[in-house]
Amino acid sequence: MPKEITDIKKFMKLWQNNKDTPATAGAKKVVYVKTNKRITKFKLRGKKYLYTFKTADPKIAKGIKDAIPATYSKIEIKGKNTKKATKRS
């Protein structure tokens, strides 16, 4: 289930001491970073939830990227163009 977090400090605490995050659950430790033209999204998979934090400020996004612990893998995903894909039959 997805869960959006709007506070930076709460998102950063998920890496440290939360029973739901991979740090204590023994799961795969991966942070997905999806960058579009305007918004950067950070996604952290927990045991129960997929935590998402998004920001439009590139300085904040760079700070969060630098703050990701070395124990986590960081996978960067480039966003698609803003044009919608058409369905072909």
UniProtKB/Swiss-Prot annotation:
Gene3D superfamilies linked: 3.30.720.90
One BP annotation, GO: protein-RNA complex assembly
Similarity field: Belongs to the eukaryotic ribosomal protein eL38 family.
Keywords: Ribonucleoprotein, Ribosomal protein
Highest taxon of the lineage: Eukaryota
Keyword field contains Ribosomal protein: yes
A Gene Ontology term for the protein's cellular component: cytosolic large ribosomal subunit
Pfam families: Ribosomal_L38e (PF01781)
rRNA-binding listed as a keyword: no
The protein's name in its UniProt record: Large ribosomal subunit protein eL38
Native organism taxonomy: Eukaryota, Sar, Alveolata, Ciliophora, Intramacronucleata
MF terms (GO), sorted A to Z: structural constituent of ribosome
